[in-house]
């Protein structure tokens, strides 16, 4: 050829010797300091000061300070060990581990874990979907939405909304001025000051003061050792143990034990269904409904109704201005002043004065040692021993002994069925006629109509074969058998069985403690409380609350507009329309439509054969079998199997711990967490996270826009479109297209017969067999065989440790490390290298096949450099070579009779080295901005980069 290298080489064939030790890598290296557009990992060990936007698509490891004044968009992990000061938005989709202070003044959106050991000051929104562990102060002035655990050991000051769906453990002060919605445990050891709503569904353990000015709804235990000042509603369904003062100005509804050792001042309603032990003063200005024991050692001043179903032991004064209904023992050692009705079904022992201005109904013993002045009715079914004066101006019905040692003045009817020993005056001015109140303690057998215009108190059986029209209250403690219509306009309290074969129309409350069998329509406009079975064969229309503790079997429509609380089985064969909450603890079998607009809490099986439309939360702990459509707009939490044969549309979270078998479409817009098998034969559209720990078999399309974590097999026969991460630990068999835009980590086999398009990392530890195209833009790490029959385009690193057989083109722009056989029958284009570093006084390059080095000079070739006609590289013996262009320096490797092609980035011109002679078709221009390196392998008859 005769051509010489000219100015390109100082020595065309000189051996330069060993390059500097710090410039030698295992395979080859080059200087990429001046390269632009590098879009893979960045690893920085010194300060990093970036004064404009930083956009990183690979890992970012920074071991010293990072100071960023533009947007920072990181789409993979960021690990920072120095201070990080970001003055504009930070958007991170991988883990972020910061071991020193982070100060952010723009939005911070993190879609994976954040672990921070220094202060974190965020002055705009933070949105985090992975765990967030902060071991020092966090100060946030924008919204904070955390969808996984947050663990904070320093102060946390949040001045806007915080929404947390994982555990929240705060070991120092939390000060929140926006709404706080926590759907899992919160454990707080410092003061907690919340100036807006707090809604907590997990345990809440607060070991210092809590001060809340918005509603507080807690659906699990609250344990507070400091003062608790709540200025709006508190609703608690778990135990509440408060060891210091509680001051509440809104309603307080507690459905489990409350134990309070400090003063308790409640200025609105309190509703408690567990024990309530108060060891200091309680001052209540709203209704107080307690359905278990209340034990109070300080004064108790209640200025509205008190309703207590457990023992009530008060060791100091009780002053009540509303109704007081106590259904178990009351023991009072101080004065008791009640200015409205008192209704007591247990013993009542009062050792000081009782002054009552409303009705007093006592169904067990009353023992009074002070004066008792009652200015309205008293109805007593147990002994009544009064050792001082009793003065009564209303009816007095006593069905057991009354022993009175003081004057007794009764100015209306008295009906007494037990001994009455009065040791002082009794003065009665009213009759006892059935045209007013009737009080009967024996059987009552009426074979025709009974028409009563006053109260009817029957303490034994009533048997009626004609119509019974009662225009005032009926109170029955024995069986009541009515074989024709019953029409009642007052309260009806039945404490034993009621059996009715005609219509029953009750326009006020019905309270039944025995079985109730109604064989025709029941229409109730007041509350209905049934504590044993109800069996209804006609329509049942209830326009207020129904509370049932026995089985309820309804064979026609039930329409309920108030709460319905059923604590045993409900079996309904007609439509069931409930427009308020339904709470069911037994099986619920509905064979026609159920339409529920309030919460529905079912703690045993639900079996529904008609449509089920629920417009608020459904919480089910038994199997749920639905054979027609289910449409749910609130959360749905099912802790056992769900089997659905119609469409299921859920517009909020679904959390399922048993199998879920759906034979038609499922459309879910909230998170879906399934901890056992899901089998779906219709389309499944999930617009938030899906987390599945059992098999998932989908026989039609699955479209998921949130993370999808599957810990067992997934078998999909329709398209699968996932727009966030998919993490699968079992086999994944997909027989149609899979399109994934987040990471995909599969730890067992993947078998795909349609196209697979993944726009983020894919990590596979089992075999992967793809029979159509695979297009991957993130790293792909496969630790077992990959067999692909369509094109495979990978735009980032691929690392494969098993055989890889590709029967069509593969195009890879990142590193590709394959440690076993690769057999490719189509084109394979790989456009990146493995490693790089810079040398001294020019660049050194080492080949794995030869140690012969060529020294390179700076500068571009001149125009009068020699040219050759065979510069395209054909006709020479060609083996492996390497092309490197960086800045204005050519980097050339010459190995024996090998050739290297140089491609200019802009003009596609070529430089060929062959037999140590330079051949060129056209000398490229100065490529100062060139920034790529291409390893090249050519055949002997055509050199193609």
Swiss-Prot record:
Region (Disordered): 1-20
Extracellular-side segments: 24-882
Entry's Gene Ontology BP terms: endocytosis
Cytoplasmic face of the membrane: 904-945
Main location: other
Glycan attachment points: 34, 43, 67, 79, 91, 103, 127, 139, 151, 175, 199, 211, 223, 235, 247, 259, 283, 295, 307, 319, 331, 343, 367, 379, 391, 403, 415, 439, 463, 475, 487, 499, 511, 523, 547, 559, 571, 583, 595, 619, 643, 655, 667, 679, 691, 703, 727, 739, 751, 763, 775, 799, 823
First and last residue of the signal peptide: 1-23
Start and stop residues of the Sequence repeats: 40-51, 52-63, 64-75, 76-87, 88-99, 100-111, 112-123, 124-135, 136-147, 148-159, 160-171, 172-183, 184-195, 196-207, 208-219, 220-231, 232-243, 244-255, 256-267, 268-279, 280-291, 292-303, 304-315, 316-327, 328-339, 340-351, 352-363, 364-375, 376-387, 388-399, 400-411, 412-423, 424-435, 436-447, 448-459, 460-471, 472-483, 484-495, 496-507, 508-519, 520-531, 532-543, 544-555, 556-567, 568-579, 580-591, 592-603, 604-615, 616-627, 628-639, 640-651, 652-663, 664-675, 676-687, 688-699, 700-711, 712-723, 724-735, 736-747, 748-759, 760-771, 772-783, 784-795, 796-807, 808-819, 820-831
Location(s) in or outside the cell: Flagellar pocket; Cell membrane
Transmembrane regions: 883-903
Membrane topology: Single-pass membrane protein
Pfam families linked: CRAM_rpt
GO cellular component: ciliary pocket; plasma membrane
Keywords on record: Cell membrane, Endocytosis, Glycoprotein, Membrane, Repeat, Signal, Transmembrane, Transmembrane helix
Region (66 X 12 AA tandem repeats of D-D-C-[ND]-I-T-G-D-G-N-E-T): 40-831
PANTHER family: CYSTEINE-RICH, ACIDIC INTEGRAL MEMBRANE PROTEIN (PTHR35577:SF7), CYSTEINE-RICH, ACIDIC INTEGRAL MEMBRANE PROTEIN-RELATED (PTHR35577)
Purpose of the protein: Supposed to function as cell surface receptor. Possibly involved in receptor-mediated endocytosis.
Protein name: Cysteine-rich, acidic integral membrane protein
Organism: Trypanosoma brucei brucei
Gene: CRAM
